[in-house]
Swiss-Prot record:
PANTHER family: BIFUNCTIONAL 3-DEHYDROQUINATE DEHYDRATASE_SHIKIMATE DEHYDROGENASE, CHLOROPLASTIC, SHIKIMATE DEHYDROGENASE. The lineage of its organism: Bacteria, Pseudomonadati, Pseudomonadota, Gammaproteobacteria, Enterobacterales. HAMAP family: Shikimate_DH_AroE, Shikimate_DH_YdiB. Substrate binds at K80, D116. Its EC number is 1.1.1.282. Pfam families: SDH_C, Shikimate_dh_N. This is Quinate/shikimate dehydrogenase. NAD(+) binds at A141, G142, G143, A144, N164, R165, R166, D167, K214, C241, V242, Y243, N244, G264. The actual biological function of YdiB remains unclear, nor is it known whether 3-dehydroshikimate or quinate represents the natural substrate. Catalyzes the reversible NAD-dependent reduction of both 3-dehydroshikimate (DHSA) and 3-dehydroquinate to yield shikimate (SA) and quinate, respectively. It can use both NAD or NADP for catalysis, however it has higher catalytic efficiency with NAD. Pathway: Metabolic intermediate biosynthesis; chorismate biosynthesis; chorismate from D-erythrose 4-phosphate and phosphoenolpyruvate: step 4/7. It comes from Shigella dysenteriae serotype 1 (strain Sd197). Transmembrane segments: none annotated. It comes from the Bacteria.
């Protein structure tokens, strides 16, 4: 487990608890900066550190979490689905997703949560958009994407049209769709992204387009899964999970097409706020973090 976050220990109290972030790659993440600013503002005896952890090293990292009596950890790519196998309890929403991004350690008993979905849907709601009865085109079938789909289904989306390449996630997408269809009133379909006609038809009729993939993230910042900007229309809300870079190519396309957009900072902020409360039991200093991180009003 490689620590990539430097820490000035003299500012910490004699007794503190450690919170981690386990992902690979990790250097792009704003979570350590955001969470540490929030912890400092709240005056809480915790520190948040990032560790480079991939699938191969994840089991050992979890043993380390227990041995060090860490309060918990964030979980990001590529570990979100694997992490489900290493916790003692999953929330109902996490079971529906099949992936987690948050682990809370209660004296060695690990609980798994997924705040990606609640964070992204909260960002949509905060923009004034009501998702109830709406339809969504969802790109990708990884942990973030399925979390958004599951939470959207729970909170009232009528239909989700999930598009994914026929890669290692495609069968997982089909299994996810089955779980949601069996447990919610939302209808989920899965289509190969190579079917561009189906993709175009979905965009023409749906209310929301959400990118839950890493396309648009460095080093793919010049890429977008929308090959033809004419597929986007002003009535479409386009939302993004990627926040580095802040303005992805997809968001640029959407703004050029007259769409309303929500950038990846919204999801980062709201999912992080929920994580903060799960780990500390305290309210997240939302307005302060918005200001110091430059996330806007």
């Amino acid at each position: 487990m490689k620590n990539t976050c430097s820490t000035n220990w003299k500012h910490h109290p004699a007794k503190y608890e450690l919170i981690g972030l386990m992902a690979y790659p990790i250097r792009h993440s704003l979570s350590p900066e955001m969470q540490n600013k929030a912890l400092e503002k709240a005056g809480l005896p915790f520190t948040y550190m990032a560790f480079e952890v991939d699938n191969d090293s994840f089991p050992g990292a979890i043993e380390g979490l227990k041995a060090l009596k860490m309060r918990g950890t964030g979980v990001s790519m590529p570990n979100k689905q694997l992490a489900c196998e290493y916790v003692d309890e999953l929330t109902p929403a996490a079971k529906l997703v099949g992936a987690i991004n948050t682990i809370v350690n209660d004296d060695g008993y690990l609980r798994g949560y997924n705040t990606d979905g609640t964070g992204h849907i909260r960002a949509i709601k905060e923009s004034g958009f009501d998702i109830k009865g709406k339809t969504m085109v969802l790109l990708g079938a990884g942990g973030a994407s399925t979390a958004i789909g599951a939470q959207g289904a729970i909170e009232g989306l009528k239909e989700i049209k999930l598009f994914n390449r026929r890669d290692e996630f495609f069968d997982k997408a089909l299994a996810f769709a089955q779980r949601v269809n069996e447990n919610t009133d939302c209808v989920v379909t899965v289509t190969d992204l190579a079917d561009q006609q189906a993709f175009a038809e979905a965009l023409a009729s749906d209310d929301i387009l959400t990118n839950g993939t890493k396309v648009g993230m460095k080093p793919l910042e010049n890429k977008s899964l929308v090959n033809d900007i004419s597929l986007l229309h002003p009535g479409l809300l386009v939302t993004e999970c990627v926040y580095n870079p802040h303005m992805t190519k997809l968001l640029q396309q959407a703004q050029q097409a007259g769409c309303k957009t929500i950038d990846g900072y919204g999801m980062l902020l709201w999912q992080g706020a929920e994580q903060f409360t799960l780990w500390t039991g305290k309210d997240f200093p939302l307005e302060y973090v918005k200001q110091v991180m430059g996330f806007g009003a």
